[in-house]
């Protein structure tokens, strides 16, 4: 068997096995980790979008909290600052302004500066183009203005 076929089979086996690794922890443990991630980023508060989702789409909310937050966001290897900058860049690049805004808010909450977020937008021009970066800049400008007004 050729090496690339073996590599392909191994990749397929690992891809199937990966979701089962998350099952080693109970859903309750994963949800607790997810809740802890959100609260660590959101000044000890829950996330309003996630809380609204619980009302109408409980399965989606639980999956988001257990998998995205409890399994992925709580992994070692990257600090919260790096994760948030990556999330802002990714959401800006795909044009998901609402999610980008949430993660930019988290980034500001944990000490990322407005200037650093602006640099992320500048970087987005390279892989995603100016229209996506301009849209992201508008969203960040709104967020910055709201946060400045809310300060005493």
Segments and roles (model prediction):
Residues 9-19:
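Bacterial N-terminal signal peptides
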Residues 1-10:
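Bacterial N-terminal signal peptides that target proteins for export
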Residues 83-91, 120-121:
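Short, structured motif recognition centered on aromatic/hydrophobic residues
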Residues 22-81, 109, 133-152:
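Acidic, glycine/proline-rich low-complexity segments that act as flexible tails and inter-domain linkers
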Residues 96-118, 134-144:
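Extended intrinsically disordered, low-complexity coil regions enriched in Ser, Thr, Gly, Ala
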Residues 93, 127-130:
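Alpha-helical transition-metal enzyme core signature, strongest for iron centers
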Residues 123, 130-134:
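Substrate/cofactor-recognition hotspot
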Residues 62-65, 94-100:
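Short acidic alpha-helix initiation/capping motifs at coil-to-helix transition points
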């Amino acid at each position: 068997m050729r090496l690339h076929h073996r590599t392909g089979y191994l990749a397929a086996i690992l891809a199937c096995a990966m979701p089962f690794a998350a099952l080693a922890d109970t859903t309750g443990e994963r949800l607790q980790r997810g809740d802890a991630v959100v609260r660590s980023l959101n000044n000890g508060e829950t996330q309003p979008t996630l809380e609204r989702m619980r009302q109408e789409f409980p399965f989606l909310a639980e999956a988001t909290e257990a998998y995205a937050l409890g399994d992925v966001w709580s992994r070692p290897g990257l600090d919260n600052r790096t994760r948030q900058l990556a999330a802002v860049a990714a959401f800006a690049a795909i044009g998901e302004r609402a999610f980008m805004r949430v993660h930019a808010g988290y980034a500001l909450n944990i000490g990322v500066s407005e200037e650093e977020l602006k640099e992320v937008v500048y970087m987005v021009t390279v892989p995603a183009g100016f229209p996506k970066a301009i849209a992201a800049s508008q969203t960040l400008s709104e967020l910055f203005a709201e946060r400045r007004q809310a300060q005493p």
